[in-house]
Amino acid sequence: RAVKRLWALILLLPIALGKTYLVPIEGEIDPALAVFVEQALARAEREAASGVPFLIDTPGGRVDAAIRISDRILQTPLPTLAVVQNAFSAGALIALSCRQIVMLPGSEIGAALPVVALPLQEPQAADQKVISALKGKFRAVAEARGRPVELAEAMVDPNLEVPGLSAKGEPLTLSADKAVELKVADLKAASLYEALQAAGFSPEVERLAPGPRVQVARFLTSSTVAGLLLALGLLLLLVELFTPGFGVAGALGLAFLALYFAGGWLAGLSGAFELLLFLLAVALLLAEALLFPGCGIAGASRAGSILASVYFTFGENALLVLSVA
């Protein structure tokens, strides 16, 4: 009878373990990707998955999105694993948030100096206040996961010199071998399958992928596309402001800004309030063009409405990105 019970437990073991849900974190870290990660973790928790490995290959991205992903990973009760192809900048914070880190051949982790990115301008290093705040976040995550705090901070602050690893003025970047040697990562693996086996995850893997809505949102909220839409939209509306009537410049400007806000809405960044502000700006634009040509009050009001809706949609963190300089 005892033997039968043992065999029954063995047969039920794969069911008890559940699936492993592989979540790819590829390309730029943006708000829509954060939505995808939250959805993936919610599904994994709902279906009692055996664990959630993240396949990370990113050059960086937005600070707010990276922190949002990091916080969600830290909150989940499920085992998490970072399988690192490249985890630069924002990717480093996400990798450090996982319970285990496995480095693939040729992978690197680090280089998390925050920069300020304005549309159509070269990124500039953030001020010391921002660096200090982000360094604190890296420190807190490293402490939570038992990683070397000093090395995590050195990934953010270029003024922290690590002898033999990084010179002063350069944020820390570690190769796969160095990351394992210094306990930033747990081990190296030759492939994703080997990484999953070594970390003790179920061999039954389902790779999750973002749906069409998230894919469109990722495209529209990427730093390049969102920056172009915002810059061109505001520029064309500025031209329309000094042009009698309502013409092509105004129509194109509104179209670009509509796409800009659509990306924020799809990514869950904007709601009814921001939409109402934008619609108010459109109403003022049409009122000035059709009813009160040349009225400066309407023009100033619509400009204020547009700028306010931009701010409330993306916030001040929209200017902060974590990327390889």
Question: What residue ranges belong to the model's regions?
Answer:
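Hydrophobic h-region of N-terminal signal peptides that target proteins for export
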Residues: 9-18
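Hydrophobic, low-charge alpha-helical segments
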Residues: 258-325
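Positively charged n-region of N-terminal signal peptides that target proteins for export
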Residues: 1-6
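Soluble extramembrane regions of membrane proteins in the secretory/endomembrane system
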Residues: 17-217
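Catalytic-loop motifs flanking and including active-site residues across diverse enzymes
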Residues: 134, 250-253, 299-302
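Non-cytosolic juxtamembrane linkers/loops
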Residues: 170, 174-276, 282, 296
